[in-house]
Amino acid sequence: MSRQEKLAALASTGVTKTELDNIDGGTARGTTAIADGDGVLINDAGTMRMTSVETMATYIGTKVGGGLEFISSTDVSAVTNIAFTGFDSSKYDSYLFTFAHITPDTDGVGIYLRTSTDGGSSYDSTSGDYLYFSGRGQEGANTYYRQDDSDGNTTYAPITNTIGIATSPEALVGFNGTLEILHPHLAEYTGGFTKGFFLNPAGSSTFMTGGFVRAAQSDVDAIQFGMTSGGFAAGGTITMYGMVNS
């Protein structure tokens, strides 16, 4: 086919310069966000085809895998308990929870967790249900402490020790930290790790880290957070992420 014939064939398709620029990259880059429903031009074994960004995302996910995926987030209100039930063993191996500025409505109490094996219909709250150990360092010389299931309440697993809210800045700081729960879909002793920062009732800066297991071989498919007395004060956010398994 001669050059003239090629040009004539191209002209007969009604292709515009703008469309050609989009194909060859000559158009200027912008900040238009990609969204569901958008199309992507691909070369399918020599044939130009349009596919959707959803199809592209699925394909890339099968090649890349891993990483964190947002599941849900709760802006804390004045409630007694907060539950997360977005566990999905077909997608995630483990889970990460982040706590931002979480405070109790009562001075000198801590945050705890309880597990569920029935999707959140009930939570494990019998004495002896949890084994745990945690250590914390506080502002001041040689102020290090530990707590474990031999000298504490075992109807829950602690995330923090006592948080101060009586005066500023304690009430403004709250608890900031993370919780990891590992492979809860397995019928094993499901456990995890916690760490975070808060101010105690005396206003001392405190860093606490620890670990726990549910003292029974069973899966976990929901988590409940609560306070050792009273409930949550309004404010702050708890967010759940899944660690993608493929």
Located regions from the model:
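Parallel beta-helix/beta-solenoid repeats that form elongated, surface-exposed shafts/blades used
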Residues: G30-T32
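Short, intrinsically disordered N-terminal pre-domain segments
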Residues: M1-G14, V244-S246
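Surface-exposed molecular-recognition determinants
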Residues: E19, D24-A28, G37-G39, N43-S246
